[in-house]
């Protein structure tokens, strides 16, 4: 009798440990939470060092996640497994309008962690602001989106690819982050006094201007760049006084 009880205890403990192990994040290059540490700054932050740290952090990407809403109105998405999910913070009427059309549907997520992972028993939660788009499907054509840049005095010019894939739309959150991160890595932005300027996105019914002297406003995080394969993106860099 005692042996049977002991075996049941051991079996239960083993199953519990296996269940706990299954909540660990997969060791993948772009989807592993352990690789991305949160570095949050206020949207009005203008300190160059803070902006550099924020736009140099690692991002997370997820495909075909399910977006859902709690009874209290908060927006969430299941990530790679049911025990790993995200709280999607949404601000502004246009971002909310886009999100509301995606409830209970498959979505793609470009995530920057607003805080460190919240771990509780058998559950882990990430916190992102925006970055959610309709999930790309096999019917969506593959394309490459390029960016051109120059300084205001036009002493130098250049360009680089900022996105390659088949997302039907892109969020300002994703494009802003990818563009700034690339410019920081190439020492074109927040270096040698080039601490301000604009990202201009036009074409295909788009008309956006992003201020490089501060973080992207939270209300813009889930606004869409429509027909991105036809969009024109230009960065103008300016020196601070």
Swiss-Prot record:
Acts as a pathogen alarming molecule by acting on host neutrophil chemotactic factors FPR2. Plays a role of chemoattractant and induces degranulation and oxidative burst in neutrophils. GO terms for cellular component: extracellular region. Keywords: Signal, Virulence. Belongs to the staphylococcal/streptococcal toxin family. Pfam families: Stap_Strp_tox_C. This is Superantigen-like protein 13. Residues 1-26 form the signal peptide. The keyword Transmembrane does not apply. Interacts with host FPR2; this interaction promotes neutrophil chemotaxis. The keyword Transferase does not apply.
């Amino acid at each position: 009798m005692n042996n049977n009880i002991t075996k049941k205890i051991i079996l239960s403990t083993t199953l519990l440990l296996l269940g706990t192990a299954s909540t660990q994040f997969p060791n993948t290059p772009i989807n592993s939470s352990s690789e991305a540490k949160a570095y949050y700054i206020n949207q009005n932050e203008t300190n160059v060092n803070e902006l550099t740290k924020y736009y140099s952090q690692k991002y997370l990407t997820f495909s075909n996640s399910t977006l859902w809403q709690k009874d209290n109105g908060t927006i969430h998405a299941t990530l790679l497994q049911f025990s790993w999910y995200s709280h999607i913070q949404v601000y502004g009427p246009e971002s909310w309008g886009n999100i509301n059309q995606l409830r209970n549907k498959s979505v793609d997520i470009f995530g920057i962690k607003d805080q460190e992972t919240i771990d509780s028993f058998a559950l882990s939660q990430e916190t992102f602001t925006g970055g959610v788009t309709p999930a790309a499907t096999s019917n969506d054509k593959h394309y490459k989106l390029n960016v051109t840049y120059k300084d205001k005095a036009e002493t130098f010019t250049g360009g680089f690819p900022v996105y390659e894939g088949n997302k039907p739309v892109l969020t300002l959150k994703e494009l802003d982050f990818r563009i700034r991160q690339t410019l920081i890595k190439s020492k074109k932005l927040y270096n040698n006094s080039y601490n301000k300027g604009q990202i201009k996105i036009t074409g295909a019914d788009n008309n956006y201007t992003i201020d490089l002297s501060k973080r992207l406003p939270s209300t813009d995080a889930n606004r869409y760049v429509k027909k991105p394969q036809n969009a024109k993106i230009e960065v103008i860099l300016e020196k601070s006084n």
